[in-house]
Every structure is written in C-alpha cells, then in structure tokens.
C-alpha cells in the first residue's frame, strides 16, 4: 500500500516505523529537514520537505497514485486542507486526519464528509486520552483496559499482587474459582519478558497479566489476580486544558472532583463552565495548596498538563503527601518507561493512543480495531473473518487448525451479540469478529494475510 504521512513528529515518525516494515511504500512530508533526515537514516522510506497542504508538495510525494493520506501535522487546519487537496486534485481514496481542537471535533459529523471537508477517518487525540483515563477510573487496579467489538469484549492488563487467589497457583485453577466465567489469559510478562501461558503456568506476584473476557466479567477476573481496590470517590485533576476540562466534565456527575489550573484566566473560565467541579487557581507543586485541599484524602490524582516534568513532579509530591494513587500524562516515550511502576502508578501516552487509532485504519484485511500495548512492542487486534473454507485460511476451521504466527493467541470470538472465549475446538464462521493478541508486532503482516480471502491461498 502506498501511504503518504504528513508530519514527522512523534506520531508521524512512530506511525512510519510501524508501517515501513509491512510491505508498504511510505513517504513522509514535513517542513523540518532535520526530522526527515533522522527518519530516512533509520528506515527505508521516501521523504519530501515542504508544506503538507501545498499541491506541489503532495504531487512530489506521489499523491497521484497514493492509496492513503495520513495527516498528523501539529496544525488542525493544515491537516484539513491537505485532505481537501488530496481529494479534489488527486482523488486519493483514503484520507485520515488528526484533529485536536474540541471546536472542530464537536461538530465532526457536519464538518467532515465528502460534501464538506473530505476526511474519511478523524483521530481526536484528546478524546482518546479522556476515554482511556475514564476506563481506568472504572476499573481501579488495572494498568490498561481496551474495548473491542463495540464494548462487548475487553482486554485488561493488571499486575498480580499477593492477596489474589491465583497467585502461586496454576492458571488452570481459575476455572475452579470462577466456574461460570470464561476468560483467556493472552500473555504474561515477567521481568519484561513474555511467557506464553499454559494451563500449568504458575502466576507469580509482580507478573503483568493480559487477559481477555466479556466486558461485564473484567472485575471478577481482576479479583483473581489482586485484592480489588475500592471504587474511586475523590479525584484531583491538574491541568485545565482540553483533556483536563473534558475529563472533569465527564467525571463530575459521579465523583467528587477538584481541578487545579495555573492560569488565572483559564481557571476562572472553567469555574463558570463546570457544574460540579471545584476549580482552584494555583500550582500543583505547591505543598501548602495540596495540604489545604486534603491531598491525603484523594483517591486518585491525575496530572494532565502539557508539561511532562510538571506532571511527574506534582504526582510524586501528591503521592508523598498521601494521595492513594497517581496517574500522569506523558508525551515523551522515554519517560513512560522510566516512571511507570515506580512512585507513578500509571503513565498515559497520548501518542500511543493516537497510534492505536491510526493503525486500525491503515492495517490490511478487515482490521476494525487495534491497540498498541507495552509501549508499542505488543499489539491487540480485532479482525473480521470473510470468505468460506475454499477462500479463507480461518473460516470453517477450528482454532487448533489455524496456523497462527509465533506469539499470537486468539482470545475471543464475537458472533453477533454472543461473546465466545476462545478454545481449541471453537470454529470460526464468516463474519466473526476475532480478537487476537500478539506479543511481538513484527508478525502483524502474517496475521493480516490470514484474514485476507484469496482463491489461491492453498
């Protein structure tokens, strides 16, 4: 597939890294020549220096015969105009744009379609982050929760702790503890190394366990791996930007929410707009302010400013002063590895959320959901099975007969409204949504090939 990526920042560069090794012809466009040279030194791709919305630049990038344009520059307006130019001048069939501003996202249905601004798929990073954080608030103790099949199935990542009934026992004993609940442990990471789970695998404290279950059973499975935490009640947010304000708006009906904003004018605006959130003007690294607002009674402290260092430092201070759990938004990928699991309980990467959303639209075969996991090393995907026994490598076959790539596990199959946790004898049918987990994303091309019907596959 011939793909043009506009923007060589963290998202554009990471997307190129994900796609360049999958038999794609990638061209990256950016105004920053140094960024482009860095990418070209690392990967086998073309680069074009220039403004991504200019017709001349797009023509030079190969828009005449491109299959897809992905606009992820730092400017919403550039991304929108680029999609319009690609549609009007080059008839590029697939156009994806990252749009940050809530003003545009709010009216997306009216703004973005072929008769207006021709964007096929809109990626709204701030909304993705809000959704991710909200899911983690719904499941205290989870490190990550990803929904598939319109929310019917979830993949959850939890750390195993002493106190969980399964610790020190084989995975096969889970059925004895939960006879009426089906789940599939897709992977276990122990000391950062993947273990392919078997029934005889002993779960150890400290293991990072990835499991798939019907969404309504997630809490029950979590209770096998750790003592369930009490639901959060008191939440303190730091940062009143798009993410902080959007999160407060979503939480304030069900939780006691306080928000700290260091810009006085912005704090005043939020105090007027938010109905049940208490807004403070101040600095979250101010110990006196935190003490006055009873940080020791806060169940969850969430720092979502656009400053990584400020988020990390304020969260560390809050934890030291008694906040039960702290979560931070981190832009730099290197920081995520450094802080998660130390004093910081959970680090959220907006880039990772954006990449996951983008990959679900650029994967081959009928891939309808993608989640990039463990800082991009692993991947969970939702693929739709098409064809019949003569044209498909999966349709009409039981799971045990399917030649899955190394490190790939089928976790669940959704058929209509029915969720079926995978077992060796489950037969895949036309139209099934198949949820898979890959401990190594380098095999994603092999998985895509499995789900591409072909009369010549034999």
Curated annotation (Swiss-Prot):
Q: Please give the biological process terms from Gene Ontology that the record holds.
A: potassium ion transmembrane transport; potassium ion transport
Reply yes or no: does the keyword Repeat apply.
yes
Per the record, membrane topology reads:
Peripheral membrane protein
Q: Name one GO molecular function term.
A: NAD binding
Q: What is its main location?
A: membrane
What PROSITE patterns is this protein classified in? RCK_C, RCK_N
Q: What does this protein do?
A: Part of the constitutive potassium transport systems TrkG and TrkH. May regulate the transport activity of TrkG and TrkH systems. Binds to NAD(+) and NADH.
Q: What is this protein called?
A: Trk system potassium uptake protein TrkA
Organism (species): Escherichia coli (strain K12)
């Amino acid at each position: 597939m011939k793909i043009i990526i506009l923007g060589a920042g963290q998202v554009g560069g990471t997307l190129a890294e994900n796609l360049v090794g999958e038999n794609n012809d990638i061209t990256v466009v950016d105004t920053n020549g140094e960024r482009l040279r860095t990418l070209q030194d690392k990967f086998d791709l073309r680069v074009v220096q220039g403004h991504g919305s200019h017709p001349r630049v797009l023509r030079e990038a190969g828009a005449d015969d491109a299959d897809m344009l992905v606009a992820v520059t730092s400017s919403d307006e550039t991304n929108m105009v680029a999609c319009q130019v690609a549609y009007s001048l080059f008839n590029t069939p697939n156009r994806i744009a990252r749009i940050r501003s809530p003003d545009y996202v709010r009216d997306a249905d009216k703004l973005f379609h072929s008769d207006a601004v021709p964007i096929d798929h809109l990626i709204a990073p701030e909304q993705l982050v809000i959704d991710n954080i909200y899911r983690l608030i719904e499941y205290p103790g989870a490190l990550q929760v990803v929904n598939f099949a319109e929310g019917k199935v979830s993949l959850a990542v939890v750390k195993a702790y002493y106190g969980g009934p399964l610790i020190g026992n084989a995975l096969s004993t889970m059925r004895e503890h939960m006879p009426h609940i089906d789940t599939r442990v897709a992977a276990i990471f122990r000391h950062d190394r993947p273990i392919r789970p078997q029934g005889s695998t002993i779960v150890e404290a400290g293991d990072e366990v990835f499991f798939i279950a019907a969404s309504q059973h997630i809490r029950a499975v979590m209770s096998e791996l750790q003592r369930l935490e009490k639901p959060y009640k008191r939440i303190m947010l730091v940062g009143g930007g798009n993410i902080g304000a959007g999160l407060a708006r979503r939480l304030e009906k069900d939780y006691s929410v306080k928000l700290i904003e260091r810009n006085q004018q912005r704090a005043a605006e939020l105090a007027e707009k938010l109905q049940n959130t208490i807004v403070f003007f101040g600095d979250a690294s101010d110990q006196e302010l935190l003490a006055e607002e009873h940080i020791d009674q806060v169940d969850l402290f969430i720092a979502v400013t656009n400053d990584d260092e400020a988020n990390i430092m304020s969260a560390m201070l809050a934890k030291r002063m008694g906040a039960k759990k702290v979560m931070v938004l981190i832009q730099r990928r290197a920081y995520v590895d450094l802080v998660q699991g130390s004093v910081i309980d959970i680090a959220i990467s907006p880039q990772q959320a954006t990449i996951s959303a983008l990959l679900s639209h650029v994967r081959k075969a009928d891939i309808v959901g993608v989640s990039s996991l463990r800082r991009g090393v692993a991947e969970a995907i939702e693929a739709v099975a098409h064809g019949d026994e003569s044209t498909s490598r999966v349709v009409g076959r039981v799971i045990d007969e399917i030649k899955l790539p190394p490190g790939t596990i089928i976790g669940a199959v959704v058929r209509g409204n029915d969720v079926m946790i995978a077992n060796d004898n489950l037969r895949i049918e036309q139209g099934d949504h198949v949820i898979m987990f890959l401990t190594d994303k380098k095999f994603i091309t092999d998985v895509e090939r499995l789900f591409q019907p072909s009369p010549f596959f034999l």
